[in-house]
């Protein structure tokens, strides 16, 4: 991944792995919409790699497509965004209690290779810009050495409204 242009201080090669317990503390998504199983190579304010193990038991495979299961491209982009939210939450030390990270925009989305049951998606996300509570990212989802999807996207931290 290339060097990020961020306004936050950059950490020097601080790598960390993030397990599912911490992911559940960092983002509000739950089954059937939690699309990150673990994260690796976390560098504060810079980058992260999310991992999604795709199984035939995913609910979307029931209708997309019967007899030819393919993960919907928009869900691959969502998985990239969730990976970015984990990076953002950990970098800003935001827990889900009282705050939510919202997906703001997606640009230049491209879908290259289908993702099928049994695939492991490696979601490489890097910060391209950060200001206060808004981050911009570039993400690439890979299966093996093939690019499945890529996009640029943005997210922001907001107070969770009381219902």
Curated annotation (Swiss-Prot):
Record CDD domains: FabZ (cd01288)
EC id: 4.2.1.59
One of the GO BP terms on file: lipid A biosynthetic process
Active site: 64
Cellular component aspect of the GO annotation: cytoplasm; membrane
Alphabetical UniProt keywords: Cytoplasm, Lipid A biosynthesis, Lipid biosynthesis, Lipid metabolism, Lyase
Coiled coil regions, renumbered to chain: none
Gene Ontology MF terms in the entry: (3R)-hydroxyacyl-[acyl-carrier-protein] dehydratase activity
Highest taxon, organism lineage: Bacteria
Localization per Swiss-Prot or TrEMBL: Cytoplasm
Catalytic activity entry: a (3R)-hydroxyacyl-[ACP] = a (2E)-enoyl-[ACP] + H2O
Protein name per its UniProtKB record: 3-hydroxyacyl-[acyl-carrier-protein] dehydratase FabZ
Originating species: Caulobacter sp. (strain K31)
Source taxonomy: Bacteria, Pseudomonadati, Pseudomonadota, Alphaproteobacteria, Caulobacterales
Gene, per the UniProt record: fabZ
